[in-house]
Amino acid sequence: MINVVGLGYIGLPTALMFAAHGVEVVGTDYNKELVDTLNEGKTTFEEDGLDELFQEAVNKGIRFSHEYQST
């Protein structure tokens, strides 16, 4: 399992890419509102291809949390 800490402009696409390639991923951010938005199936910013990558990662089981994980 990989725990990506920080789900902003760098962390979110990184977490999504790992998950889309079959790695078990938990994306963690201290911002509960941001995590809740991701858990509702919505991205938090626009970038070409991000929505498709997000959907693929969700289908592969990515999880989002505001609580830090132990790996």
Name what the model sees in each region.
Residues M1-T71:
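Structural/interface elements that position substrates and couple domains in central-metabolism enzymes
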